[in-house]
Amino acid sequence: MFESTSFGRVMVLDGVIQSTERDEFSYQEMIVNLPLCALETPAKRVLVVGGGDGGVLRELCRHPSLERVDIAEIDEGVIKASKEFLPHMAKGFSDPRVRVHVGDGLQFVKDAPEGHYDAIIVDSSDPVGPAAVLFERPFYECMHRAIRPGGVVCTQGESIWLHLDIIKEVTSMCRGIFQGGAVSYAYTTIPTYPSGQIGFVLCTKSRDGKPLEPNEPRQPAPPMDLSSGPLRYYTPELHRAAFVLPAFAAKVLAEGTS
């Protein structure tokens, strides 16, 4: 953790910037509201894998429909550091709907009851070290089982400028798992991440044989939160626009799809 003149407090893990006070909201608002606002019915139960800085929890807790939020974070040190140095992000940990589970996210998803969650959000680091399993087939198969029909998964999906091969591999794998559903890539802009862009892979589980396309917002944006203030990035218009990719990326990700 260090203090930056331009970006405020900065959290770094293994030499990689994870969040800064100045621009973290663009990532947090999009990774939460893209999946939750795409649902046909408001979410009641959500699982967060990773997300120990608390930013995802903060944005989730804006949603009044939520009854319970589980978070599985493997590194308790991240939670403690965020509570001490980034309290504006960590405020979600104090919400009574939140249950914190320190441990392996893959194992937590494996142990979840079938169809238990409306949405699963994976706020992971890059696919190296302990986070590598969160980009592999067994994890996505477990998430598919753990969400209800009509539910949605949203994972940190890397950058089209740096990791297009990984994105194609993950989206192709997900289409084989979420058959009858929909798999899409969306992105947000965030200056302090490499290339200034980071994406999300969104997968929906078929209900009655009908795919739920995640690029259409069906739920309203959450109301202003008295402690967090209004949304600063997400809008319904930006929701739709986030799925419109540059030609080179759209071409690569469309290859092999019907």
Question: What role is predicted for each listed range?
Answer:
Residues F2-V12:
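Non-catalytic substrate-recognition/targeting regions of SAM-dependent transferases
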Residues S19-V152, W161-I166, R175, S195:
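The AdoMet/dcAdoMet-binding core of the Class I SAM-like
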Residues Y140-H144, I166-Y187, V201:
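Conserved Class I S-adenosyl-L-methionine
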Residues S172, P194-S258:
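SAM/dcSAM-binding transferase cores
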Residues T188-T192:
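Short proline/glycine-enriched turn/loop segments at secondary-structure junctions
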